[in-house]
Amino acid sequence: MIKLLYPKFWQKRNIIAYILFPISWIYQFLGFLRHVFARPVILPAKVICVGNCSVGGTGKTQIVMYLANLLKTQNIDFVIVTKAYGSNLKEATIVKAEHSTLEVGDESVILAKHGTVIATKNIKQILPLIHELKPSIIIVDDFLQNPYFHKDITIVSVDRQRLFGNGFLIPAGPLREYPNRALSAADLVFLVGNNSGGIPVSLASYANKLIQAQIVASSDIDKNKNYFAFSGIGNPERFFLTLKNYGLNIVGYKIFPDHYNYLQEDLENLSLLAKTNNATLITTRKDYVKIGDSSDIIVCLDVKLSINNPNLLYEKIFKKD
């Protein structure tokens, strides 16, 4: 799997974006063909699909965690289906405690602490496992653009800072599909980020289905130390902002590509940077689960989702036919 950083031209158009724009037409046409010829499978449970219009972190994982915890409080049997990014997975697998991130993906390992998880790269492979587990609800993490299964409820996550980038499709921009289509079809739109500033103009027409959300720290971390931060996630800027809002003194940071698998050399270099700055290393839970034996010298920041309108979410999840 190709791992890329979020290039600057994805946020603000430049000559590179315009050069790549014709390739975006090909991407769009291939997506159109997928939808034309797809025959969606109807899964034997209510399906809640959480996804986004664009590449990069938009808070999907935190939304899935929130939904999982919500369903637990209602004693509803559910299963989480993940896309197994960064893994060498060949077939759909129920995630166990002994599975590594290389086997099932980092998000699968994290979400397995919140409920039963099926990791897969092909949504059609989950059918035998779903029949075995017999959940009432299936939470699908990603697969929003996948036309091969029926979705009962769709939730689109949007990052408040990046929104829809430069407005171009991959590879000229960050978009997997144009926002108007995804947002119009969505049952709920989560705007994830600092709630100050009101609703962006591009989302104003979706205010009746909009939930504003913030990702906040849920860890108890010593604020009297210096920290050197690092991450290999889709939106590292939000992680660094969360650290700042938590009141930590960040003396430096290093960004790795999304879903990055750390080498021993990387960890040694990070340790040297931290030592040089008289600091302690700090990272995200997604990175932490991939570090292995070095995790005892690194602080992990856990986060959770805080939303402004839980009643709207409850209404959609529990009252929709």
From Swiss-Prot:
GO terms for cellular component: plasma membrane
Record flagged with keyword Metal-binding: no
Reactions catalysed: a lipid A disaccharide + ATP = a lipid IVA + ADP + H(+)
GO terms assigned for molecular function: ATP binding; tetraacyldisaccharide 4'-kinase activity
Pathways per UniProt: Glycolipid biosynthesis; lipid IV(A) biosynthesis; lipid IV(A) from (3R)-3-hydroxytetradecanoyl-[acyl-carrier-protein] and UDP-N-acetyl-alpha-D-glucosamine: step 6/6
Role of this protein: Transfers the gamma-phosphate of ATP to the 4'-position of a tetraacyldisaccharide 1-phosphate intermediate (termed DS-1-P) to form tetraacyldisaccharide 1,4'-bis-phosphate (lipid IVA).
Family from the record: Belongs to the LpxK family.
Cited PANTHER family: TETRAACYLDISACCHARIDE 4'-KINASE (PTHR42724), TETRAACYLDISACCHARIDE 4'-KINASE, MITOCHONDRIAL-RELATED (PTHR42724:SF1)
HAMAP family: LpxK
Protein name: Tetraacyldisaccharide 4'-kinase
Originating organism: Rickettsia bellii (strain RML369-C)
Organism taxonomic ancestry: Bacteria, Pseudomonadati, Pseudomonadota, Alphaproteobacteria, Rickettsiales
Gene responsible for this protein: lpxK
